[in-house]
């Protein structure tokens, strides 16, 4: 009898644990179609360096050396003017994005489409469209692109301010080109500032993000986009549990300016501010290390 009771309690605990885990299937089915794969092609011209040969007379003692070791007819050989023909090749890259309006406007990261000569957007129904960049902002890593299509499925937007640390979130994207891949995790922190990014209060998560996920959406459990997956912190180049997303309200403010005025307008207060450390507080005779110090006036 006791064994039966133990087994029953064990099965009950398993059932309770399973019920406590989130189910993402409905979210993916409803909103996954608004996530796209982005591929770019960039034409790169690489100039070949020619040997730097001084202009020497035939009676110069080094003339024979350069004549022998630089092939005849090659630019740079005595008597052969000109430079080598530049070498051209294509650079291809992959990223993710998502549709924000039914008439073909999409958001992605600026670094996904930077310097691209051709941008191709692939929908989940396998249709492909050429896209053009409406505008981009390197400081926030946001780009607004457009495809010529209508009746598209668009995402719903949420409020990142309402996110709580520990809340479940989900990412959809194309890591390493594997389209419509779904990963999930929790919000690890809010308002993170990275050394190279002074304009973005990042959402930190432990959602698995890899190359190709950049520009894809971060969903809350209500199926609303709360961020754009942008970068990871890693010592190896691979995912190590530290992912960072741009809050969607920041992204929408940027895209609104790009769409309406074509550029980003930012205010400046003309001062450089730094955090008051314990050492600074002691040197100024402060009771606690709090507040901010105006370090310089521009």
Whereabouts are the PLM-identified features?
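N-terminal regions of proteins, emphasizing targeting and processing segments when present
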Residues: 8-11, 32
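Serine-dependent protease modules
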Residues: 18-298
């Amino acid at each position: 009898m006791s064994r039966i009771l133990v087994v029953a309690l064990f099965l009950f605990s398993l059932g309770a644990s399973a019920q406590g885990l989130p189910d993402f299937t409905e979210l993916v089915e409803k909103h996954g179609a608004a996530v796209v794969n982005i591929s770019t092609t960039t034409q790169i011209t690489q100039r070949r360096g020619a040997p730097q040969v001084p202009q020497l007379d035939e009676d110069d003692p080094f003339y024979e050396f350069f004549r022998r070791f630089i092939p005849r007819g090659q630019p740079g050989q005595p008597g052969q003017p000109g430079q080598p023909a530049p070498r051209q090749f294509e650079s291809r890259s992959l990223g993710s994005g998502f549709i924000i309006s039914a008439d073909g406007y999409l958001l992605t990261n600026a670094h996904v489409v930077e310097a691209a000569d051709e941008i191709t957007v692939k929908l989940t129904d396998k249709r492909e469209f050429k896209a053009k960049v409406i505008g981009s902002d390197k400081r926030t890593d946001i780009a607004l692109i457009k495809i010529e299509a209508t009746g598209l499925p668009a995402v719903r937007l949420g409020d990142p301010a309402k996110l709580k640390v520990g809340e479940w979130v989900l990412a959809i994207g194309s890591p390493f080109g594997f389209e419509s891949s779904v990963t999930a995790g929790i919000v690890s922190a809010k308002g993170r500032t990275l050394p190279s990014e002074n304009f973005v209060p990042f959402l930190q998560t432990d959602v698995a993000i890899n190359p190709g996920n950049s520009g894809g959406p971060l969903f809350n459990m209500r199926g609303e986009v709360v961020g754009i997956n942008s970068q990871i912190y890693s010592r190896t180049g691979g995912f190590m549990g530290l992912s960072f997303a741009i809050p969607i309200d920041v992204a929408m403010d940027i895209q609104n300016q790009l769409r309406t005025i074509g550029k980003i307008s930012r205010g400046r207060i003309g001062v450089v501010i730094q955090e008051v450390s314990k050492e600074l507080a002691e040197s100024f005779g402060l009771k606690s290390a709090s507040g901010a110090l105006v370090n310089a006036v521009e």
